[in-house]
Amino acid sequence: MAGGVTSGSAEGWSKRFEEGLHPVIERFNASISFDITLLQEDLDGSIAHARMLGECGVISLEEAAQLEGGLEKIRSEAAAGEFQPGLVDEDVHFAVERRLIALLGPVGKKLHTGRSRNDQVGTDLRLWLRRRLDDLDCELERFQHALLTQAESHRQTLIPGYTHLQRAQPLCLAHHLLAYIEMIQRDRDRLKDVRGRVNISPLGAAALAGTSVPIDRQNTAAALGFECIYANSLDAVSDRDFAVEYTAAASLVMVHLSRLAEEVIFWASEEFAFVRLSDRCATGSSLMPQKKNPDVPELVRGKCGRVFGHLQGLLTMIKGLPLAYNKDFQEDKEALFDTVRTTKDCVEAMSILMEEGLEFCSERLAAAVESDFSNATDVADYLVAKGVPFREAYQLVGAVVKRCLDEGILLCDLSLEQWQEFHSAIAEDLHEALAPKRVVAVRISEGGTGFDRVEEQLRHWRSRLDSVLS
């Protein structure tokens, strides 16, 4: 493209450039197709910057008002579908500036005074992520409510507890669901911590060294709701720690969702049959008419990989970058945008699954906890209470279990005489101690699955979650 700069994406560059970009390079270089996501935040940041320039006397108050009016006009055009940036704009920042100049003429060219796209994009990204963090927290709270409602419906329902995916000890189903509420609360706490480091303003750091223009960074930070400003301009435009931290925290959210999803998939299988999936949250087979597939938890489990991949991608992208800004940073947007969208979608889907997508099969669960050896530990505890050393009791119960397995019976099938062949301290009250509900009820340690302890936790979480709503 000889004869001067003709590429639209080069219009914001200096006259050092005599030729426009090669069309392929122009497409390769542009980010407008995805960073248009930041339009509202770009307008918010630009309005705060324009007001500050006016208040500091860098431009007149009248010019600042004109700039704000033009930016709000662009917002209105975008809402009406009339603002249509293209490849010619390269990115959202140039798109806004180009339209502003078209609306205001020379005054529009004053907006970028004392600012670089380097601090501008950092500001936009933080504003955008801050809002999405708040949205995600609301979704996670909804998920906790859904889990709690299910738990409250199953105060007395038992479910086998597993270690190594082998039957271990019976649990109160509410206790099992409460465990996920605890996990999600840790996620919410982590994300709140991340939000604190997102909420720092880089605006005014300019390209990397600050600016000679007499701006007021505290002014724009306060106007945009940031807690403080970056103390070092070089760090301000170089930092993407917050994006990594968010993606790491989101990865843990996905881990917790995936663990529950995995359990639901098992529970919904005919081999377990612990839950029934509703028609609204399951799919069928194109070939096998009897199938009802757990697609929701399977997709949640599968989508973990893309979030984990984004975390690895961000770390790999940042690790070798010299200070300050590098074009590599353009690669943070799609990773971050997709992580936010995927995580929120998965939390929402799992909330719906818990709210209306599955029903626990109480009869099947009751039969499951009555047909195994998950009460074996209670025999050992019974013997310990009779004065038998634990390790001796442990070995003795192992021998009893072996005999039962050899004979194809359960512990509850042994007569008192058969029990006493193993130890004379065993009395008639052992059979009561082996009842599944008794096994659960006696787990009275703080945080345990005993019904009284579970009631305490149900009341705690109901009070805690309801207090947020009131």
From Swiss-Prot:
Reaction(s) catalysed (UniProt annotation): 2-(N(omega)-L-arginino)succinate = fumarate + L-arginine
Predominant location category: cytoplasm
Gene3D superfamilies: Fumarase/aspartase (C-terminal domain), Fumarase/aspartase (Central domain), Fumarase/aspartase (N-terminal domain)
Metabolic or biological pathway: Amino-acid biosynthesis; L-arginine biosynthesis; L-arginine from L-ornithine and carbamoyl phosphate: step 3/3
Primary enzyme class: lyase
CDD domains per UniProt: Argininosuccinate_lyase
Compartments where located: Cytoplasm
Keywords, alphabetical: Amino-acid biosynthesis, Arginine biosynthesis, Cytoplasm, Lyase
EC code(s) of this entry: 4.3.2.1
GO term, biological process aspect, one: L-arginine biosynthetic process
Cystine crosslinks: none
One Pfam entry name: Lyase_1
One GO molecular-function entry: argininosuccinate lyase activity
Family designation: Belongs to the lyase 1 family. Argininosuccinate lyase subfamily.
Record PANTHER family: ARGININOSUCCINATE LYASE
NCBIfam families linked to this entry: argH
HAMAP family, per the entry: Arg_succ_lyase
Protein name in the entry: Argininosuccinate lyase
Source organism (scientific name): Prochlorococcus marinus (strain MIT 9313)
